[in-house]
Amino acid sequence: MRASSVSVLIAVTSAMFLGCTLTRAPASPEGADGSATGSADAGAGGDAAGPNTIDVKCPTLAMPTGSATAYVDGRSAGSEDGSKASPFRTLAKALATAPPNGVVWVAAGSYRENLVAPDKGLTIVGGFTPGFASRTDACATVVEAADAKKPVITAPAGVEGLGLDGLTVQKGSRGLQAESDGGPTQGTFTIANAVFADNGTVDGEGGGVSFDRVHGRISGSVFRNNRASKGAAIAAAGDVTLRIEGSTFERNVGHSDHGGALYLGTRSATITRNTFRSNEIGKDVGYGWGGGVILYGNGAQPVKGDLSYNVFTDNLASVGAAVFVDDGASVTMSHDLIFRNRAYRENGVARGAAIYVDGLGGPTEGSTLVADHLTVAFNAYDETGAPAGSSRGGGVYMESYSKATFTNSIFWKNGEEPLFGDPTCALDVRYSIAPSSCGGGAACSVGAGVFEPTEIHFVDEARNDYHEKSTAGHFAGGAWVKDAVTSPAIDKADPAKGGDTEPMPNGGRANLGAYGHTGEASKSP
């Protein structure tokens, strides 16, 4: 589990990439301005859809604002000089002849190649119709490994960057491998509006993307059906920055014991507006931690992470099926929606189906989690997807001198002892719907504003809509629908946190949960 330090920042799309379809997640108070340009908004205010509508298969694409320096169309006949009229037939030839900082446009089609990126700072842009007059979606241009034992795209040591926009990258030992030789940190690799599918091996880390001491920006993309020992979608290590936003991670499988979708040894991390669905860890060994995301420390330096506006559902692990904070990492979470995740049973007990916080071992080496405005619900299922007969720590499970603080959050129906920590841990809960006590002997502080109602009144749990009902109206995809009842979560956040970011009428006080303190908060009656 040890790796050199990484800085991972997952956030806003680079302006040079256009036309992505973002996953839908709880809206931020800041609005939709941080989303990438494209066919779907990721935003706040009154027009962002709820998490029951998350389903992105092929990101849609807009025309770039600039022009190309080389063109590729595998169906081209006759001479090939890389012009629009006589495009190259292979990507390899375009990469070899493109000038520094060149932009390569690629027409729809299937390209069976193993590419080696030159050190030119190139950008490869796919999804074009014949003639390059328009673009369709990222599934139109497919780059598939000719030799499945090699990565589809390799960036050797010394390559200072590469851009990928609007491509499907599939069926290689890795989708993209960018690793340094132990020298100075390399340049930036940018992925936008792409699909990484069916990549990886069971014994290598980072099936979709493997970054070692290179910077990266990933936005509006889809990672599905990738596999690896750890980090089936993405593994990152080294003193780097990595930005990812508005991307979907689904059915990625880790065959070893740490990190189903993301395996990040990071110095700083921000993971925002992504959807993690049906990822798993422990496929071969029968146990593992961090089905969706693991952020782990390395003992050598402070490790910080920030997760916000993400959706986690149906992920599987022994503990921490959604999120695992490990080995001294310090992480914040806000406005994340975590529901119906699964945990392997050990001795008949399913543990920690949502969040797991574990230290490195010593009294000063615990991990730290500070969380605000979470909705953590129905995380009491076993590996088969059936309700667990016995569960423990379904909301949060803590070990080894770790500390966690939760405010303005909702913990609902997460099984027996949903808040659990061993005697070395400290757990603080304030202004939340949560149990009044913790299991496992942890130092448990249940402070002001904590209560546990008999009913929560989510809008529609069966359809995964976790907005709260209100007689004044709940957000419903651009409209406001009035309900017969009002959820007890409305206007129950910390009074010091006003309701100014919520739609009127808002009672002057924010709601609890992932949608509280956003433009999608249910109105106050």
Predicted segment positions?
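N-terminal extracellular ligand-recognition/capping segment immediately after the signal peptide
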Residues: 92-95, 100-132
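Predominantly extracellular beta-rich ligand-binding scaffolds that present long acidic/polar faces
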Residues: 113-122, 178, 190, 243, ...
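Right-handed parallel beta-helix
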Residues: 159-288
